[in-house]
A protein has these predicted regions:
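N-terminal pre-Walker A segment at the start of P-loop NTPase domains
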Residues: 1-26, 30
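Domain-level recognition of nuclease-like catalytic cores that cleave nucleotide substrates
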Residues: 389-410
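Hydrophobic positions on the alpha1 helix immediately C-terminal to the Walker A/P-loop
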Residues: 48, 52
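Conserved lysine of the Walker
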Residues: 45
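Hydrophobic anchor at the beta1->P-loop junction of P-loop NTPases
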Residues: 37
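Interdomain motor-coupling "hinge/lid" segment immediately C-terminal to the ATP-binding subdomain
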Residues: 2-10, 131-133, 138-238, 271-274
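Short glycine-rich substrate-engagement loop in P-loop NTPases that contacts/grips substrate
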Residues: 66-96
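Accessory nucleic acid-recognition modules appended to NTPase machines
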Residues: 66, 193-351
Length: 410
């Protein structure tokens, strides 16, 4: 019988420093804003907050840290906004820099009244995290009357995945694993694919069948579940509520375009999907008709749909889209005459065009991917990101990148 070594609870819960996010919060230290950490459930918001607290303790003296985690029963008695306010005021220390951290803030009903009141006193540096369905980007301006800054946290990037496993010796194998496992790092604690998949499923189902249903008082979850699965299965396809409602109804899930439109908005508000609008490159204008929707993490697609319709070209396109958003780009789908450019990425004055593919070793596929890029007449960079497994090279002014290399670049 094989000998098994049992480890203590927590031995598998390895953590890494998510430098990009930590540096961003450090930049905001002391600014007169409420710092709000958002992101999908289990994306690492609480871990980021804890890392920042450790940074403060290690680098500053004469500080007072007031930390409240509403998941901890210790704070059960202050899950009422008057009590929360009183607790913070009681723990204020005169003559010190007072930091207030509230984790899972949505568990205190009307928390915004307490936070706004504390903010108005001008004596706390305030940081909060909350569930993705209850601390929505769209709601922040309504909830918080003072100035606020949102720090949006994504699941692990491929670079962070490699950092977690402390290995880039075989980046191709690691990338193959990442495309399936995704970036929800809590799943990495499990030894088997089945257990990892179950973890991801539970996170996803909690968002769809509990968080969103509770937030929006939905009568049932069937349409929402089928819609979400449809969007996963149709990544990279142009989509409209009217078209989706017709397809769902034809497949024994009766609904209408109004409901579909609302539910898509809910899924995007909760950061399950990101909507990418179209941009007319020649006319230099944004288009209102049809959009594309990309899933927050490729691991969710595999956990929910399995290998069904496992089109790696679409999976890679999804990974590239989320990476562009993670790097702070505004992302659009490009339209040029009758052709389509997978992504137009813009950040300040920087702009470039991207085509994403799986295998471009065949001449016909290679020419098909190059064709739309070659028709663009401006001087902005153009690139193809594909599974080449070769160093970067150029063709007719187009940079050809291996996807694993490109993901590790920044």
């Amino acid at each position: 019988m094989k000998k098994i070594q049992f480890l203590k609870v927590g031995d598998y819960m390895k953590t890494i420093t998510r430098t990009k996010y930590l540096d961003r919060i450090i930049e905001l230290n002391g600014t007169p804003d409420i710092k709000i950490i958002t992101g999908i459930r289990r994306s690492g918001k609480s871990k980021l907050m804890q890392a920042y607290i450790e940074y403060l303790k290690s680098n500053f003296e004469n500080i007072n840290i007031i930390f409240i985690d509403f998941m901890d029963l210790v704070y059960e008695e202050i899950k009422e906004y008057h009590a929360l306010h009183a607790y913070v005021e009681e723990h204020y220390q005169e003559g010190k820099t007072n930091y207030l951290f509230v984790d899972e803030v949505q568990m205190c009903p009307k928390f915004e009244l307490a936070i706004n009141s504390l903010y108005s006193k001008g004596k706390y540096d305030i940081y909060v995290t909350g569930s993705n369905a209850f601390l929505l980007s769209a709601d922040l301006a309504t909830l918080f009357t003072g100035r606020y800054i949102e720090i949006h946290v994504f699941p692990f990037s491929f670079q962070e995945y490699c950092q977690y496993y402390n290995d880039v010796s075989d980046k191709d194998k690691l990338f193959d694993d990442y495309a399936i496992n995704g970036g929800l790092a809590g799943s990495y604690a499990y030894r088997t694919e089945k257990d990892r998949t179950n973890y991801i499923k539970e996170v996803y189902e909690t968002i769809v069948t509990r968080d969103l249903v509770q937030k929006y008082a939905l009568p049932d979850t069937l349409v929402l579940q089928r819609l979400s699965e449809f969007l996963m299965d149709n990544i990279s396809n142009l989509t409209s509520p009217n078209k989706v409602s017709q397809l769902l109804t034809a497949n024994e899930t009766p609904t209408n375009h109004v409901t579909v439109g609302k539910y898509i908005k809910y899924l995007c508000n909760a950061f399950v999907f990101y909507d990418i609008k179209r941009y007319d490159i020649r006319g230099k204008k944004y288009l209102e008709s049809s959009e594309k929707f990309y899933l927050c993490d490729s691991g969710i697609r595999y956990a929910i749909l399995g290998s069904r319709n496992m089109d790696y070209g679409r999976v890679y396109e999804n990974i590239v889209c989320i990476e562009l958003l993670r790097r702070g780009y505004d992302v659009y789908v490009g339209k040029l005459y009758q052709k389509e450019i997978d992504f137009v990425a813009q950040r300040g004055s920087e702009k470039f065009y991207i085509q994403v593919s799986d295998n471009i070793s065949g001449q016909e596929t290679f020419e098909r991917e190059c064709s739309p890029l070659l028709q663009i007449r401006d001087a902005y960079p153009k690139m193809i990101i594909a599974r080449t497994k070769h160093p970067k090279y150029s063709y007719e002014g187009i940079e050809i990148h291996d996807i694993a290399d490109w993901l590790l670049q920044e």
